[in-house]
């Protein structure tokens, strides 16, 4: 016959179960876990992160303190500062400008002397700290296809490329009417408004006729993010010194 036996659980299992229950109750008393109950310790993930981040920032501030009194050119000549700046660059800038600062289509080359917004230390600091918005007006509807082709021919001529002389002559008139306000009457650009030099053979998006036509027709809308809030003043200055050195400014 079948009969029911009384088989108690092992003592160690029972004690482990009791300990688990007690631990759970204590946890929910000390820490948040039940509805809006915040726990008697008042602990949150956010507060723990803030404390740990503050401690880390204090260590960083102590490390960066010797660089605070240096100018950008002095930082560019300091090996320790540049080693730190290289780490900052690889973590914050290389994604767009490349590990060597050589840039890519739509992202400026930082390793040459061609500067859209100015290459002096103050201008570089300003660019990194506050970012830049490089808006090129679309002229397709204003000029029409024939007018766009003429301006493209003239811009190619300005930069030493071969183009149709008749179209270039017509494009020169359009250029003086619509383009010179930003790029200047000679096409050499204006750093104050971020208008690039069209005569030096350095191109952000490309210099072939098709790309130039796209640029003139549709315009461009480049944007450089601001890093002041993310990195703080001292790290921005280190990055400025790194970029300044990349471009040969420290030589």
Regions found by a protein language model. Give the residues of each.
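Basic, gly/Ser/Thr/Pro-rich low-complexity segments located predominantly at protein N termini
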Residues: 15, 29, 103-106, 136, ...
């Amino acid at each position: 016959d079948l009969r029911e036996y009384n088989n108690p659980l092992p003592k160690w299992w029972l004690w482990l179960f009791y300990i688990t229950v007690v631990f759970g109750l204590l946890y929910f008393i000390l820490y948040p876990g039940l509805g809006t109950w915040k726990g008697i310790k008042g602990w949150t993930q956010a507060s723990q992160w803030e404390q740990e981040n503050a401690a880390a920032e204090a260590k960083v501030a102590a490390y960066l303190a010797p660089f605070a009194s240096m100018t950008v050119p002095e930082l560019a000549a300091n090996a320790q500062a540049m080693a730190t700046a290289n780490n900052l660059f690889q973590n914050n800038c290389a994604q767009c400008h490349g590990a060597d600062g050589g840039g890519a289509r739509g992202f400026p080359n930082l390793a040459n002397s061609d500067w859209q917004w100015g290459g002096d230390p103050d201008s570089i600091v300003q660019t990194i700290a506050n970012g830049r918005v490089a808006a090129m007006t679309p002229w397709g509807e204003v000029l029409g296809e024939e007018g766009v082709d003429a301006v493209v021919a003239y811009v190619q001529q300005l930069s030493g490329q071969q183009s149709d002389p008749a179209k270039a002559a017509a494009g020169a008139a359009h250029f003086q009417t619509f383009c010179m306000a930003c790029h200047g009457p000679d096409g050499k650009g204006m750093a104050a408004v971020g208008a690039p030099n069209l005569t030096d053979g350095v191109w952000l998006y490309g210099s072939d006729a098709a790309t130039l036509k796209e640029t003139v027709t549709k315009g461009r809308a480049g944007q450089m993010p601001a890093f002041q809030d993310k990195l703080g003043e001292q790290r921005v200055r280190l990055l400025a010194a790194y970029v300044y050195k990349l471009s040969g400014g420290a030589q």
